[in-house]
Amino acid sequence: MNNPWSNFSSAFGCPIQIPKQNSNVPPSLPVPVGVFGVPLRSGCSNQMAFCAPELTDRKPEHEQKVSKRLNDREEDKDEAAACSLDNQYDRKIQPCIDLVDSLRKLDIGNDLMLPAIAVIGDRNSGKSSVLEALSGVALPRDKGVITRCPLELKLKKMTAPQEWKGVIYYRNTEIQLQNASEVKKAIRKAQDIVAGTNGSISGELISLEIWSPDVPDLTLIDLPGIAREAVGNQPQDNGQQIKTLLKKYIGCKETIIVVVVPCNVDIATTEALKMAQEVDPTGERTLGVLTKPDLVNEGTEETVLKIIQNEVIPLRKGYMIVKCYGQMDFCNELSFTSAIQQEREFFETHKHFSTLLDENKATIPHLANKLTDELVGRIIKTLPAIEKQVHDALQQAKKELQKYTQSTHPTVSDKTIFLVGLIKAFNEDISQTMHGKESWFGNEIRLFPKIRREFRTWGVKLLESSAKVEEIVCSKLPKYEDQYRGREFPDFISYWTFEDIIKEQITKLEEPAVAMLNKVIYMVEEKFLQLANKRFANFQNLNNAAQARIGCISDRQATTAKNCILTQFKMERIIYCQDNIYADDLKAARAEGISKDTKIKDLAFGCASRQCPSFALEMVSHVKAYFTGASKRLSNQIPLIILSTVLHDFGNYLQTSMLHLLQGKEEINYLLQEDHEAANQQKLLTSRISHLNKAYQYLVDFKSL
């Protein structure tokens, strides 16, 4: 006979070296140790999905197998070694599960993705019966939804004979339970307080801890059964509320999903399995549990077997089958041991399902072992990631706490240094913004690209004005010819006419330039205010001082910039250009000619003009030539004025003004006075850091086991 442990390996990937043994002597086994020193439960393969078959030879006849199980229950020769292995495994299970329970109790769920087992099922699927069998306590049973809040079941196995003990937690309430019979009433009361008495659903967690020698070391989260329609006085949207709540829990990548399905229904139609497939399409995190095998119609047993053998809807973690004791068993005070014995006898004597017992795929004890193995395996696998999450969250919380003063900067000297640091950081933000290097997040746009957009619009405005020169000349020349021509002969180019047309066009650009200035200064002021709110959010007085300076400097720089722009346009109305530059622009304008759309023939200059439109052509060329140079000048000059006065000077003056706050040392306490909201936030951060430090210590202590 082959050594039964030859293929044995750790549940967490660590192979075991088995020494050669005499075939007639039970093997002496080393304890397999996985990651963080967790040994493998006896009888489990490295996949943690199937257990080693029993080693006794059995005859194929069903009657002989039943007789052998019921009348001759000899212990296997390897029981001693296996029991020793189980004991060492069990000593590691509880610390492993307690670790995650302790982390979850610290209320740092937003920082960590903790492994969990969530139990879901359609209404009347037998979900509550499975949980009752695992926990050994009766749960509330009402018409409609039984579980109306997420119920966390923390089962703690006691090694030495001790009295049963339980504790229920909800809304900062802790109630001690002295007897298992008190659980049902306590849960119903908690659900009524948390979710109300009208059958509503709540996402608030209720936690129940049970210590008993008859329970496995296991933590489960019982979720409301999926209801297709409301019952009684329940809200009509109960079904949707339940689905939303379930997706919140089973959608977490670290959650193992236990789907409870009755044997006497079409598994493909169950809502619970459909929801599990939505969030876990590969079935990697899902375990199916079939219930009510005693209600299977005769002739359909093979269909159930195919489901359990993963031939219908495959799941990576496979399927198990259980027969739970019902409410009547609780009423008759059927003991836990007797109920387990009855379930085992059912499978041992069943013509079709007895083989499942051989494969450890049936009964509540095997389900408990399976769930424990899966949870421990998930915990071990995610411990490095959890440790990193705790470390990162702790560093981030400490960084945020540095924004506050009361606990970290108690003395005036410390506060002065802290204020210097705050102002220095703010001034650095201003400097980075001035040079277009400020930090940004997500889809946020930096300030300089926003300003550049306005400058681009200004450039387009100048191009449009330049393009309209021909049309303007054609519309203005008749008026100047008829109303303003002096003693000059027709077709002579009038410099005064040329100058008036240029001045009029330049003046029209003054208003858009000032409008652009106002837009840009609003952007700059808004950005600087955002930076002040970011750096000084926890210090209202300091923030107010910064905002007052920003507003004052903004008004002053807006006036300065506007005066500079008006001065620039005043100079532009003095028609002047270097001869060589103008000559080049005129040459280019003459070469380009007048566009085909210009209707020179419609000009009414007099007889001579109508016969020869050269005067109009020449005037258009001169106006275009000058306006080309003026446009280039204004296209750069106005943005330079705005950048200089509204961005750079504004930023420099603001930085200097903020440094002046350091001169009044008697005002430091006033400036660093925290508002009520900031004080509360500081307390929350301090508490969060304390919890994260505890979490980190839990991880360190666990690794040292």
Curated annotation (Swiss-Prot):
What positions does the domain Dynamin-type G occupy? 111-384
Q: Record-annotated residues binding GTP?
A: 121-128, 222-226, 291-294
Q: Quote the cellular component terms of the Gene Ontology held in the record.
A: cytoplasm; microtubule; nucleus; plasma membrane; presynapse; synapse
Which residue ranges does the record annotate as region G3 motif? 222-225
Show the segment(s) annotated as G1 motif: 121-128
Region named G5 motif:
323-326
Tell me what happens on changing residue 94 to R: In strain: 16, 17, 25, 7, Black-bone, Black Minorca, Fayoumi GSP, WL-F and WL-N
Among its keywords, does the record have Nucleotide-binding?
yes
Major localization listed first in the record, in broad terms: cytoplasm
Pfam families xrefs: Dynamin_M, Dynamin_N, GED
Subcellular location as annotated: Cytoplasm
Spell out the SMART domains in the cross-references: DYNc, GED
Ranges of residues in domain GED: 616-705
Q: Where is this region: Disordered?
A: 60-79
Instruction: Decide whether keyword rRNA-binding is in the record.
Output: no
The effect annotated for residue 548 to V is: In strain: 25, WL-F and WL-N
Q: Which GO terms describe its molecular function?
A: GTP binding; GTPase activity; microtubule binding
Lineage top rank: taxon: Eukaryota
Q: For this chain's UniProt record, which GO biological process terms are given? A: defense response to virus; receptor internalization; synaptic vesicle budding from presynaptic endocytic zone membrane
Tell me the outcome of changing residue 583 to T. Answer: In strain: 16, 17, 25, 7, Black-bone, Black Minorca, Fayoumi GSP, WL-F and WL-N
Entries under PROSITE patterns matching the protein: G_DYNAMIN_1, G_DYNAMIN_2, GED
Annotated region (G4 motif), positions in chain:
291-294
Q: Where is the composition biased (Basic and acidic residues)?
A: 60-74
Q: What does it do?
A: Does not show activity against influenza virus, VSV, Thogoto virus or Sendai virus.
Which protein family is it in? Answer: Belongs to the TRAFAC class dynamin-like GTPase superfamily. Dynamin/Fzo/YdjA family.
- This chain's protein is named Interferon-induced GTP-binding protein Mx
Gene behind this chain?
A: MX
